[in-house]
Amino acid sequence: MSLLTEVETYVLSIVPSGPLKAEIAQRLEDVFAGRNTDLEALMEWLKTRPILSPLTKGILGFVFTLTVPSERGLQRRRFVQNALNGNGDPNNMDRAVKLYRKLKREITFHGAKEIALSYSAGALASCMGLIYNRMGAVTTEVAFGLVCATCEQIADSQHRSHRQMVATTNPLIRHENRMVLASTTAKAMEQMAGSSEQAAEAMEVASQARQMVQAMRAIGTHPSSSAGLKDDLLENLQAYQKRMGVQMQRFK
């Protein structure tokens, strides 16, 4: 796996699923391939994205700044600086300075990542902030190692939280989660169907599913009534793809 592929993988792991994630993936690909070299426009685009947490925006801004060649005097962005200040906690800053001194002696991506993984996400973000604000300089490889370690820490906590929700025995939470997943799947079906004539059937199924979820929420239904809703939708989607000559069995 190439270095940039690894960086893209880690960064995308902390971005919530949805159309915006696909857009960010495309931007990262373009930046890494050298097809997008307008850092100013990229940062302006990133700043106005909804849904993303300030920290995720800060990490993406840091990655864009590391990758896109820019003039020395280009202004640092406040939204990235604020996100990478470790919540203003002096302990984070102290640890970030210690980490930075270790990273300065390191020259490889994997070496930097190993060192960084023993620090908290707050200290890692603060260390990125030091480098972003030009208070410290490390090689690009080392900076990418720091980025990936930070993303791994964040993704770990997101995964724990997600696992707790999936494993919950509370029927109301499980019911709502199934309806949210069904609704999201229906949206994805509508996007994939596009505007071809054969798409009408898939669009109809997706539309009915969304209406059904809305009705279930409006009238309040038994928690078990949503069981299998997403799987039914996915079966419909796969049947539609088969008719279109597409063989993809990786949705479940």
Swiss-Prot record:
Residues 165-252 are annotated as: RNP-binding. It is found in: Virion membrane; Host nucleus. A motif (Nuclear localization signal) lies at residues 101-105. GO terms for biological process: viral budding from plasma membrane. Residues 1-164 are annotated as: Membrane-binding. Pfam families: Flu_M1 (PF00598), Flu_M1_C (PF08289). Disulfide bonds: none annotated. It comes from the Viruses. The keyword Oxidoreductase does not apply. GO terms for cellular component: host cell nucleus; membrane; virion membrane. It is a peripheral membrane protein. Belongs to the influenza viruses Matrix protein M1 family. Most abundant protein in virion. When expressed alone can form virus-like particles in transfected cells. HAMAP family: INFV_M1. Homodimer and homomultimer. Interacts with NEP. Binds ribonucleocapsid by both interacting with genomic RNA and NP protein. May interact with HA and NA. Cannot bind NP without genomic RNA. This is Matrix protein 1. It comes from Influenza A virus (strain A/Memphis/1/1971 H3N2).
